[in-house]
Regions:
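Conserved PLP-binding catalytic core of the aspartate aminotransferase-like
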Residues: 294-330
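Active-site-adjacent capping/gating segments
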Residues: 181-182, 343-354
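Active-site C-terminal subdomain of aminotransferase-like
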Residues: 177-178, 184-299
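A generic structural motif
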Residues: 108, 139, 261-263, 308-311, ...
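N-terminal entrance/gating region of PLP-dependent enzymes' catalytic architecture
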Residues: 1-51, 325, 330-333, 342-344, ...
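Conserved PLP-enzyme active-site core in the AAT-like
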Residues: 59-220
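A glycine-rich phosphate-binding loop feature that marks nucleotide/adenosyl-phosphate handling sites
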Residues: 276, 296-306, 338-344
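Glycine- and acidic
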Residues: 20-27, 49-55, 78, 100-106, ...
Length: 378
């Protein structure tokens, strides 16, 4: 999952690094702090937040940590509920924060099972516990999209908080998604917090993540004093609303420059790059199906597929052999495990999971029929 950064972003990052600004306090990065606030405004507008509180982070792990920390600060008697395919960050950060964590089973397409979620919320309500629900828009393994638009009314009925992990998929809200998938992306504006990684599909060098809060009043949870900083100005110092202290201003400069070149608008040049990734996933899917492969329907730009067969163990072995064969051909794929509930194909389940092949089509050169043929060729 490494997308080439925009050369403009690399140049802005490189040039800014010569003055080495620190966006913790205004006296360490006055210009880049202003740029960071602009980048957060642009990200907020993209997801439908009118006046978001937020900042850049080193990546999605820290961004999700902060979102879960604010959730805990707003309700100390909470539990984190997330799709079983959610990024492992959530279970790890819940452990760090001392918050109970529970994985929610998924449906066949890898999205959170709404019926099971509702049952869990009902049981928690009987115990007087209000949950923090993590809805993932683009799981790392399958690119699955949790049904956010349907989770929201259920969550509100039980007094639950909603955090959206759109670290991988967030930018796709600008793309030409299917009507059903777009419905869930459009619902992001009703979430309490959102995480997006500009260093995934935002054309940024590593590391650049972002956390956004819909309610600016939640900045009160960050309130602290510092004997070393914050005394040079009555203006907001970004360090006052972050858990991280020192943060490179170069990341803000790079993202700001990219946003000037490619504004976040539907049907714009930036959105077209995302559409090419969607087209690549569909193109690979169709090529694989034509050659007899089993393929899951891609919701974003991640394609999961498998050779056919009779037994899960035999199919898994064939898929692993195919993976190794392609690596020798300089076609670098990945492996993933599917449980029976996530697998629509008929077979004998003589083992507990099926090893399948996974391809992330996030680079411009992936939208190429010749490449799809090379991947599908056995």
């Amino acid at each position: 999952m490494i997308k080439p950064p925009l050369p403009l972003a690399q140049a802005a990052h490189w040039m800014t690094s010569f003055i080495n600004p620190n966006n913790h306090a205004l006296d360490g990065g006055r210009a880049t702090s202003a740029l960071e606030l602009e980048t957060i405004g642009a990200l907020g507008s993209m997801v439908g937040y009118s006046k978001p509180l937020g900042h850049l982070t080193s990546g999605g792990t820290t961004a999700n940590l902060e979102a879960l920390w604010v959730a805990r600060q707003s309700n100390t008697n909470t539990i984190v509920l997330a799709n079983e395919h959610a990024h492992y960050t959530h279970s790890r950060m819940s452990e760090v924060l001392g918050i109970p964590f529970q994985a929610i089973s998924s449906t066949e397409n890898g999205a959170m099972n709404l019926l099971i979620l509702r049952d869990v919320l009902e049981k928690l309500q009987c115990k007087g516990i209000k949950a923090t629900i993590v809805a993932t828009l683009g799981t790392t393994g399958m690119g699955a999209v949790d049904p956010l638009a349907d989770i929201l009314p259920t969550a509100r009925a039980y007094g639950a908080r909603i955090h959206v992990d759109a670290a991988y998929g967030g930018y796709f809200t600008l793309a030409d998604l299917s009507k059903e998938v777009q419905r869930h992306f459009t619902a992001m504006d009703s979430a309490d917090s959102i995480v997006i990684d500009p260093h995934k599909h935002g054309l940024q060098p590593y590391g650049c993540g972002a956390v956004l809060f819909k309610n600016p009043e939640e900045g009160r949870f960050y309130k602290h004093d510092s004997p070393y900083t914050y005394f040079t100005s009555d203006q907001l110092h970004l360090g006052e609303i972050t858990l991280e202290c020192s943060r490179a201003g170069a990341a803000a400069a790079a993202l700001w420059a990219t946003q000037q070149k490619f504004p976040y608008v539907r049907s714009g040049n930036f959105a077209q790059r995302l559409n090419e990734s969607l087209e690549a996933a569909q193109g690979l899917k169709n090529t694989l199906i034509a050659q007899g492969w089993w393929v899951l329907e891609p919701e974003l730009d991640i394609c999961v597929f498998s050779l056919s067969g009779l037994k899960a163990s035999e199919i898994s072995a064939k898929n692993r052999m195919f993976f190794e064969q392609k690596a020798e051909e300089n076609i670098h794929l990945a492996l993933f495990s599917l449980s029976q509930q996530n697998c629509p194909w008929e077979m004998e389940w003589d083992v507990s999971s099926l090893t399948v092949v996974r391809s992330v089509l996030m680079k411009p050169e992936h939208n190429d029929p010749a490449l799809w043929e090379r991947i599908a060729r056995i």
